[in-house]
Curated annotation (Swiss-Prot):
Residues 691-700 have a biased composition (Basic and acidic residues). PROSITE patterns: FN3, IG_LIKE, LRR. Residues 691-716 are annotated as: Disordered. The chain crosses the membrane at residues 632-652. Residues 525-619 form the Fibronectin type-III domain. The lineage of its organism: Eukaryota, Metazoa, Chordata, Craniata, Vertebrata. This is Leucine-rich repeat neuronal protein 1. Residues 702-716 have a biased composition (Polar residues). It comes from the Eukaryota. It comes from Rattus norvegicus. Residues 653-716 are cytoplasmic.
């Protein structure tokens, strides 16, 4: 290859320096449109290559037409935020134009933009106009166009050949229009498209093969489209897709079948969808996935076993700001060796299992702050010397339970508590307290619980039948996770369904009350109180608990008997293992409401009441027996008179007592000593000992407890 002499080389160098100066001088010396700015500015190509371009900036000038004295050397023309609705031929002499910005103007039709013969144009901005349709071949002259921004318009119709001629198009923004369908024929003319943003359109739905022609697409944004379902073959053909966003849709489950058709996906955004749970198979064998976002999901309650399975390149998982996410299975992750960052803050999590963390060998940082953490054996691993994991914002990690540790920092509490086993705790948001179902539908109730050792979960139906994973039934089916399925639900299936989580330490329960077509049958009452005997000054009550629903090892923190009428109310704490109660010092011929209320450690309560009237005080009537039969009529007449007088006397006495017992009883009770109930009876009460156990203990023959109501709290 011939070499230049030093003199010639110097000449060429000087010439190279002069050419840009001459170009800049020509544009600056030519007449620049009034109020516009004409200068050389940095410019980046669609491939992000740095260049310098001759730029005419006429933004924000309220222009109604394009200035007529534009230089033919113009490469970038900026006319953003004006009032231009139509062009004539002002653009025809701009043969070097590479970027044109008409965003925020008043165009209603693409033909009125005047794009003919702009063969060098690579970037076109038409966002925020009033364009309503794209007709066939409306952009066919833009053979070098690489970026088209036509988002935030009023486009409701795009013809099949609207993008014809755009074989070099790399980026297409169609988001925020009024499209109701996506037609795969649009993309036949854009085989090299790499980025497609088509979100925020009111499409009826995504169809199978919708994006099949886009084999080179790398990023697809389907955000804010109210999508409720993604068909299994909707993403077929997207073999190069690396980034996919379903942000802010209405998906109720992970579109796992569709995701399996995207083999090279690296970044997946499912944020802000009402997905209820992440379950086995949802994210499986996605061999290139690196980052997953499941944030801001208002209905997400659990991440179940093997929900994330065989994801060898996943390095970051974000599952934050999910107000109902209260459960992550200890085996939620399987074969996820590369995960480094696990973000779980601002959820409703009580704990994260140590085994979950141990299944992630490369984990470097975890964020579980701003969760209602239970400071017991389940999270002891946090203070373990075996872990080198960095906790994000550790000063924001506070105990929410047990009550004695509430508000304290987690690490301070765990130093004090070293227990290895703890009671089950059912996650409270996994299923609702009340539901109204339509006849014939299938109901799923998800019950999840955390404890050490891991609890067994079973359900009890309104009639007391126990449903386990081994139960064989056409009506009920229980998954190993704790989800109860009730098929073909009918009116007779209404009632209270109880989830029981049990381990060697005890049990926890939660109840879902199910109505069917607005109807709730009365056969589901758990606690029932009865009147066994009534006297003038006392009432003997007893109660029955459905032992199939409330197991004998369920501990209750309080149980209270309350006697109430319009004039006086008093209460008494019920002793341990009592099933009968004798209420004394009552007034005769008086109406009372008697209620038994029990509460457990989770403030769940059961209550049963009965109305009863005490008997009238007895009067003795002695009537002489006359022997003569002739006096029988007189005796009968006397008896009638006596009975009449007695009835009147009883009525007067009853009125007198009702009028005055209030003050006399108050005076009587004020003389008695006040004894706190927690000194009379133990603070922890177990009411649910089965009748069969009671018989074994020989307690069935014991006399009912005599309770002097004068020693109860006196409330007005």
């Amino acid at each position: 290859m011939a070499r230049l002499s030093p003199g010639k080389a110097a000449c060429w160098m000087v010439l190279g320096l002069l050419i840009p100066s001459l170009t800049e001088s020509s544009i600056l010396n030519s007449e620049c449109p009034q109020l516009c700015v004409c200068e050389i500015r940095p410019w980046f190509t669609p491939q992000s290559t740095y260049r310098e371009a001759t730029t005419v900036d006429c933004n924000d000038l309220r222009l109604t037409r394009i200035p007529g004295n534009l230089s033919s050397d113009t490469q970038v023309l900026l006319l953003q935020s004006n009032n231009i609705a139509k062009t004539v031929d002002e653009l025809q002499q701009l043969f070097n134009l590479t970027e044109l910005d008409f965003s925020q103007n008043n165009f209603t039709n693409i033909k009125e933009v005047g794009l003919a013969n702009l063969t060098q144009l690579t970037t076109l901005h038409l966002e925020e106009n009033q364009i309503s349709e794209m007709t066939d071949y409306c952009l066919q002259d833009l053979s070098n166009l690489q970026e088209l921004y036509i988002n935030h318009n009023q486009i409701s119709s795009i013809s099949a050949n609207a993008f014809s001629g755009l074989k070099n198009l790399l980026r297409l923004h169609l988001n925020s229009n009024k499209l109701k369908v996506i037609d795969s024929r649009w993309f036949d003319s854009t085989p090299n498209l790499e980025i497609l943003m088509i979100g925020e359109n009111p499409v009826i739905g995504i169809l199978d093969m919708n994006f099949r022609p886009l084999s080179n697409l790398r990023s697809l944004v389907l955000a804010g489209m109210y999508l409720t379902d993604i068909p299994g073959n909707a993403l077929v053909g997207l073999d190069s897709l690396e980034s996919l966003s379903f942000y802010d849709n209405k998906l109720i489950k992970v579109p796992q079948l569709a995701l399996q058709k995207v083999p090279n996906l690296k970044f997946l955004d499912l944020n802000k969808n009402p997905i209820h749970k992440i379950q086995e198979g949802d994210f499986k064998n996605m061999l290139r996935l690196k980052e997953l976002g499941i944030n801001n999901m208002g209905e997400l309650v659990s991440v179940d076993r093997y929900a994330l399975d065989n994801l060898p390149e996943l390095t970051k998982l974000e599952a934050t700001n999910n107000p109902k996410l209260s459960y992550i299975h200890r085996l939620a992750f399987r074969s996820v060796p590369a995960l480094e960052s696990l973000m779980l803050n601002n959820n409703a999590l009580n704990a994260v299992y140590q085994k979950t963390v141990e299944s992630l060998p490369n984990l470097r940082e975890i964020s579980i702050h701003s969760n209602p953490l239970r400071c017991d054996c389940v999270i002891h691993w946090i203070n373990s010397n075996k872990t080198n994991i960095r906790f994000m914002e550790p000063l924001s990690m506070f105990c929410a339970m047990p009550p004695e540790y509430r508000g304290q920092q987690v690490k301070e509490v765990l130093i004090q508590d070293s227990s290895e086993q703890c009671l089950p705790m059912i996650s409270h948001d996994t299923f609702p307290n009340h539901l109204n179902m339509d006849i014939g539908t299938t109901l799923f109730l998800d019950c999840r619980a955390m404890a050490e050792p891991e609890p067994e979960i079973y359900w009890v139906t309104p009639i007391g039948n126990k449903i386990t994973v081994e139960t064989l039934s056409d009506k009920y089916k229980l998954s190993s996770e704790g989800t109860l399925e009730i098929a073909n639900i009918q009116i007779e299936d209404s009632g209270r369904y109880t989830c029981v989580a049990q381990n060697v330490q005890g049990a926890d329960t939660r109840v879902a009350t199910i109505k069917v077509n607005g109807t709730l049958l009365d056969g589901a009452q758990v606690l029932k109180i009865y009147v066994k005997q009534t006297e003038s000054h006392s009432i003997l009550v007893s109660w029955k608990v459905n032992s199939n629903v409330m197991t004998s090892n369920l501990k209750w923190s309080s149980a209270t008997m309350k006697i109430d009428n319009p004039h006086i109310t008093y209460t008494a704490r019920v002793p341990v293992d009592v099933h009968e109660y004798n209420l004394t010092h009552l007034q005769p011929s008086t109406d009372y409401e008697v209620c038994l209320t029990v509460s457990n450690i989770h403030q769940q309560t059961q209550k049963s009441c009965v109305n009863v009237t005490t008997k009238t005080a007895a009067f003795a009537l002695d009537i002489s027996d006359h022997e003569t039969s002739t006096a029988l009529a007189a005796v009968m007449g006397s008896m009638f008179a006596v009975i009449s007088l007695a009835s009147i006397a009883i009525y007067i006495a009853k009125r007198f007592k009702r009028k005055n017992y209030h003050h006399s009883l108050k005076k009587y009770m004020q003389k008695t000593s006040s004894i706190p109930l927690n000194e009379l009876y133990p603070p922890l009460i177990n009411l649910w000992e089965g009748d069969s156990d009671k018989d074994k203990d020989g307690s069935a023959d014991t006399k009912p407890t005599q309770v002097d109501t004068s020693r109860s709290y006196y409330m007005w």
